[in-house]
A protein has these predicted regions:
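Cytosolic nucleotide-utilizing catalytic cores of signal-transduction proteins
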Residues: 1-156
Length: 156
């Protein structure tokens, strides 16, 4: 609510980071640090707008701890030229990310993207042909989400 209000009233891009609930003053520094981390991740993964909590980036935090050389190795093993086409096409990547963020819900994704349902299904089929991953299925969606995170971390 607050981010939307500030964006509407001030016309400014607003990004809010939320840390963790603390049991007292001694944990405030940790919570603040986590809020800053959420903001840093939001810039890379969400365009730096909206409200973001530290918890929503737990997988990113875990993958960031893996040495870059291992991530690059994993990415080069998995990604072929066709998969890179999906990652380099902003429209396709946005479609996939929105689909994943709406819990694999076709109707909600098409509404959020102002797109006809059949157009969305066509794009999801195109992603499946390029990657071999049917992101409508949870296991493939998880794999694809991990690939997106690794890809964005490698571009950072």
């Amino acid at each position: 609510f607050l981010a939307g209000f500030l964006t509407e009233e001030l016309g400014a891009r607003v990004c809010i980071g939320a840390g963790s609930v603390t049991g007292g003053f001694h944990d405030l520094q940790l919570s603040y640090s986590r809020a800053v981390t959420a903001l840093r991740y939001a810039e890379v993964f969400s365009g730096g707008e909206g409200v973001h909590s530290y918890k929503e980036y737990m997988l990113v935090k875990l993958l960031e701890e893996v040495p870059k050389s291992r991530l690059d190795e994993f990415l080069s093993d998995i990604t072929e030229e066709q998969i890179r086409e999906v990652f380099d096409d902003e429209e396709m990547l946005l479609t996939a990310e929105k689909f994943l963020s709406t819990s694999l819900n076709v109707s909600e994704t098409s509404r959020a993207l102002y797109m006809h349902r059949n157009t969305l299904l066509y794009r999801l089929d195109k992603i499946e042909k390029a990657t071999g991953l049917n992101i409508r299925l949870f296991p493939d969606a998880v794999t694809f989400r991990i690939l997106i995170i690794i890809y964005k971390l490698s571009k950072k």
